[in-house]
Structures are given as C-alpha cells and as structure tokens.
Amino acid sequence: ARAVGIDLGTTNXVXAV
C-alpha cells in the first residue's frame, strides 16, 4: 500500500504494507 501510495489513510493508521 505504501509503495503504491493508494492506501494513504490505511498506511498511516494501520501502517499496512
């Protein structure tokens, strides 16, 4: 998610990879 930059909200909160 972080690499794609689509799940910004999820990556920030859940910190999903």
From Swiss-Prot:
Induction remark: By stress conditions e.g. heat shock.
Gene Ontology molecular function: ATP binding
UniProt keyword terms in alphabetical order: ATP-binding, Chaperone, Nucleotide-binding, Stress response
Keyword tRNA processing belongs to the record: no
Similarity comment text for this entry: Belongs to the heat shock protein 70 family.
Protein task: Acts as a chaperone.
Protein name (database record): Chaperone protein DnaK
Annotated source species: Mycolicibacterium smegmatis (Mycobacterium smegmatis)
